[in-house]
């Protein structure tokens, strides 16, 4: 008998918040007025209280350091099937931004729930997309 495993977007997986804690994000020297430890604690606590609706993980530098703190909201498996894609959020500091991110993730995240309008103002392009757009400018190759 042959068995098949489910892989990729077909898997049941929760929304994932990827929190940059590289060279600039989470660095109190760069943003001394922000409580970076509190933000991470708040995200972890909210994920624990979400009943598995979303998870949090940290990573090294994601790239757009001039827009720190950066959080990437990755869609759940169902959100991905419905067309949701990873959403990059810049300048994600303070209570209001953190609460908006938690609320959106708890509501289902990309592909499932609409983001809070104030959070949409903080959406940024992923570094790879910015590089692709920059390469498209200038003289055409022959």
What are these regions (language model features)?
Residues 4-6, 43-44, 73-78:
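Intrinsically disordered, low-complexity boundary segments flanking structured domains
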Residues 26-42:
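Compact Cys/His-rich
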Residues 17-31, 57-76:
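Local cysteine-cluster metal-coordination motifs and their immediate loop/turn environment
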Residues 67-142:
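Short flanking/linker segments adjacent to small metal-binding domains or redox-active Cys/His motifs
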Residues 7-19, 41-64:
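Immediate flanking context of iron-sulfur cluster ligation sites
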């Amino acid at each position: 008998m042959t068995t098949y495993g489910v892989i990729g977007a077909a898997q049941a997986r929760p929304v994932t918040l990827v929190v940059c804690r590289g060279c600039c994000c989470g660095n109190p020297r760069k943003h001394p007025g922000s409580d970076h430890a509190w933000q991470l604690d708040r995200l972890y606590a909210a994920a624990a209280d979400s009943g598995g609706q979303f998870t949090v993980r940290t990573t090294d530098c994601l790239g757009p350091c001039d827009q720190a703190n950066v959080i990437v909201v990755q869609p759940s498996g169902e959100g991905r099937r419905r067309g949701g894609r990873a959403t990059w959020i810049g300048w994600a500091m303070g209570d209001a931004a953190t609460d908006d991110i938690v609320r959106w993730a708890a509501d289902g995240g990309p592909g499932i729930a609409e983001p809070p309008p104030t959070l949409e103002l903080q959406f940024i392009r992923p570094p790879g997309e910015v590089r692709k757009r920059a390469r498209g400018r200038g003289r055409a190759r022959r």
